[in-house]
């Protein structure tokens, strides 16, 4: 095919024949798309028993009516299943018995097949085996290898090749020669036998092959059905309305917020924990801007004021603690001195009482009245007059 060399994933190149019209495709996804568009025109929803015209309508129907965003399509009969387990049960039953099996089905397809087709219903899909699939993959690898002529250039022309291979190599191309060499290689045969011994069972091989080839996961999003919503009549039931958050609308209406400040106060500069902090009332708050108003700006400003008050209280508390430490130190020093004095004088002496001061006697001299004899006589008479009488 001309477009095989332009594929983005050359490792996925291969031949995927359609079991209905025998067309061959390079990718399994191309085969699946072909089967959905050419052979399966309508579906029947098993939940609500509605007829669905196409695959795109099936996806939108499951998304809108039943709120199902993921479903797994069988590439053999294009039935839709809710999970991989149901799909594998269906495929195992198709391989063993030729019947769909008892699995949960979301939608069944109605195929439109020509009269010349071999299989007229999805239940009559041709069975396959792991051995045939392995040989098919080996042939695909051989067909994709375009450099075999450069790897074995002499074997094609060697006369001894007839003894090695009983086939006629004269008319073989590089890819056909590689297929024949792989089929007759004893090392490859031993490797296949070892792989067959290590293979646990055919059921596991079939399930792995089914998971690699026959399951198609379909995810539906709003973007997938956007085109269909615009082109068709939309019922009120299927409209998805995206409401704008009320908080955003409130912010848009209240975008102009006036923040009151003290314009007349000078900037405040203080030191907290050995860090200089300069607070200016002219600077805008980082939590308030003209273009965007944060919902928690008021709470942030309240927290900042609370932190400022806490720092001031903390500074006062530190000063009080320092003063208390100084008082405690002085008390300890005085207590040490008292203990030392008690050790020196175990019995304290009573305090010394000084005598009361006496009347000062006048100094002898010519100006002293008591030195006069007349004055002395008057004093003696006064003393005798004031003396009490003695009773016999």
Curated annotation (Swiss-Prot):
Mention any one GO cellular component term assigned to this protein in its UniProt record. Answer: nucleus
Localization annotation: Nucleus
State the SMART domains in the record. Answer: ZnF_C2H2
Signal sequence range? none
Q: Which UniProt keywords apply?
A: Metal-binding, Nucleus, Repeat, Transcription, Zinc, Zinc-finger
Claim: Zinc-finger is one of the keywords in the record: yes
Q: Does the keyword Plastid apply?
A: no
Polar residues: compositionally biased ranges: 112-123
Q: Which Pfam families match?
A: zf-C2H2 (PF00096)
Q: Name one GO biological process term.
A: cell migration
| UniProt function note | Probable transcription factor that acts downstream of egl-15, to promote migration of the HSN motor neurons from the tail to the gonad primordium during HSN cell differentiation.
Q: Which PANTHER family match?
A: C2H2-TYPE DOMAIN-CONTAINING PROTEIN (PTHR24376:SF235), ZINC FINGER PROTEIN (PTHR24376)
Please give the name of this protein: Zinc finger protein ham-2
State which gene encodes it.
ham-2
